[in-house]
Structures are given as structure tokens and as C-alpha cells.
């Protein structure tokens, strides 16, 4: 089995190193990751300049682009054959609910999915680097399961692992995405030169953390596994929007 690894924290991130160590025992791995932290890059591609691919001293490849760039470059321009799986992570922090829209970790897995490769995004739902081995072990177990018993149809799974030792996990739960409240406002600062600058505010707290959500699974010390899809269509509103638009002919609102 051949696995392409990537992330959004950068090729030097300890979570990526921990994941690579765990998966190298059960598969041939190739690591292609951003040259710097690209958290929050979402599904962006670099289109205004060429990309470079370099190899670091630890054998990992790194790209001067986004997580999506890394997977796209690796699958369409670097590797001779499609990998059997793309695994993105281990992210330093949760990717639950609305986080998935912004997450570079999820985006790297999404790009693999779009290119026809079964893909996993794995995140540690906390900031304790000491528990990266917990998430790495979970990732290895899910990869082994996939190798012996493949899921039918396209696969894009978002996995969040509680920030606790492996022996304290209370199992695994298939979940839906929860929701967060809107993010905190930007934080304004003055530089020593008097320039006003802004930091993006913190993510909002959980709003929908009810039964079946990723938030609740993590609260219960359970691994959250959420199947994702790309289709953003709001099917329940199609008829309402159609009726709304059909009630006004084009040009009827012009003054």
C-alpha cells in the first residue's frame, strides 16, 4: 500500500512526523507538505506563480504553496501512479463543524478525494503534542481497516481524536458536523511605527454540539469520524429559490 501524506502545519510539524512514523510501519509513504504553516488556507490553489518541490534532510518533500497545491502537485505531477490513499495531518488542533470550511488539513484530503484517491484528514482535538501518538495510532488502525475491507464508493473522512492518551479513549463514533457560533471579532493593534494591524479573532464556541455531532463525540472522549461530501447545494431550498426568481422576469427590477 502506498500513502501520500500532507498537512497544513508545514513539513517540519511534529504531528506530521508522528503520523509518518506510524504509517511507515504498514505502508510505503511519500510526504509532500507546505514549506511553512498554512493553517486556514482552505482549498486554495496557487495560480499566480510556479511552485517548487524540494526535499528536506528527513526525506520529506516540501512545496512553496498550499496544502491543496501539495497534493495536486504530488498526484498529478510527481508520482508515477496514483497513491492508494491520501492522509492529511496530524493537525495541531481540532477540525470540527465549521472549521472544515477553512481547514488546510481537510483541504489536502479533499484534493486527494477530487483526484480519485480515498482520503482521510486527521486532527488532534487539542494542543497537547504529547498525545500525537494517540491520533497516529488511530490513523494507522483506520488505514489497516481500509486496506483489508475497503469502503464502497468515494471516501473522504474527517477524523478528530480526543487530546488524551490512547488507553483513555472511549471508542469511536460516526458523526455529523456540528456548528460554531460566529468567530470573535478581529483584534486591532498598533505597531511600534504607529501602523494599525489586525489579527483574525478566535473561532467561536460550539453552537450545535448535540447528539450525533463531532463536538459531542470529542466531549465524550470518543474518536469522531465524519464522512464528508463536496456538493454544497442546499437541496431543500431549490424550489423556494426557483419560485422566488420565477415570480420576477429578468429586467423587471431595473429602474
Swiss-Prot record:
Its cofactor is a divalent metal cation. This is 5'-nucleotidase SurE. The gene is surE. It is found in: Cytoplasm. Nucleotidase that shows phosphatase activity on nucleoside 5'-monophosphates. It comes from the Bacteria. The keyword Metal-binding applies. It comes from Nitrosospira multiformis (strain ATCC 25196 / NCIMB 11849 / C 71). Its EC number is 3.1.3.5. GO terms for cellular component: cytoplasm. SUPFAM superfamilies: SurE-like. It catalyses: a ribonucleoside 5'-phosphate + H2O = a ribonucleoside + phosphate. The lineage of its organism: Bacteria, Pseudomonadati, Pseudomonadota, Betaproteobacteria, Nitrosomonadales. A divalent metal cation binds at residues 8-9, 39, 91. Belongs to the SurE nucleotidase family. Keywords: Cytoplasm, Hydrolase, Metal-binding, Nucleotide-binding. Pfam families: SurE. Binds 1 divalent metal cation per subunit. GO terms for molecular function: 3'-nucleotidase activity; 5'-nucleotidase activity; exopolyphosphatase activity; metal ion binding; nucleotide binding. InterPro entries: SurE, SurE-like_Pase/nucleotidase, SurE-like_sf.
Amino acid at each position: 500500500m502506498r500513502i501520500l501524506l500532507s498537512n497544513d502545519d508545514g513539513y517540519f510539524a511534529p504531528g506530521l512526523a508522528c503520523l509518518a512514523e506510524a504509517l511507515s510501519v504498514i505502508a510505503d509513504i511519500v510526504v509532500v507538505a507546505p514549506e511553512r504553516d498554512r493553517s486556514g488556507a482552505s482549498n486554495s490553489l496557487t495560480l499566480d506563480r510556479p511552485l517548487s518541490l524540494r526535499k528536506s534532510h528527513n526525506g520529506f518533500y516540501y512545496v512553496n504553496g498550499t496544502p491543496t497545491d501539495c497534493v495536486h502537485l504530488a498526484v498529478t505531477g510527481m508520482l508515477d501512479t496514483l497513491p492508494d490513499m491520501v492522509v492529511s495531518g496530524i493537525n495541531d488542533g481540532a477540525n470540527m463543524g465549521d472549521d472544515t470550511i477553512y481547514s488546510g488539513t481537510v483541504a489536502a484530503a479533499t484534493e486527494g478525494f477530487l483526484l480519485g484517491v480515498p482520503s482521510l484528514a486527521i486532527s488532534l482535538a487539542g494542543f497537547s503534542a504529547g498525545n500525537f501518538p494517540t491520533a497516529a495510532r488511530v490513523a494507522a488502525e483506520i488505514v489497516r481497516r481500509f486496506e483489508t475491507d475497503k469502503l464502497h464508493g468515494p471516501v473522504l473522512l474527517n477524523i478528530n481524536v480526543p487530546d488524551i492518551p490512547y488507553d483513555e479513549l472511549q471508542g469511536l463514533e460516526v458523526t455529523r458536523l456540528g456548528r460554531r457560533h460566529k468567530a470573535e471579532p478581529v483584534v486591532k493593534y498598533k505597531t511600534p511605527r504607529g501602523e494599525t494591524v489586525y489579527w483574525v479573532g478566535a473561532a467561536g464556541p460550539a453552537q450545535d454540539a448535540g447528539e450525533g455531532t463531532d463536538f459531542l463525540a470529542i466531549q465524550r472522549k470518543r474518536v469522531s469520524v465524519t464522512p464528508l461530501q463536496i456538493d454544497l447545494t442546499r437541496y431543500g431550498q431549490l424550489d423556494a429559490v426557483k419560485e422566488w426568481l420565477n415570480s420576477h422576469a429578468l429586467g423587471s427590477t431595473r429602474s
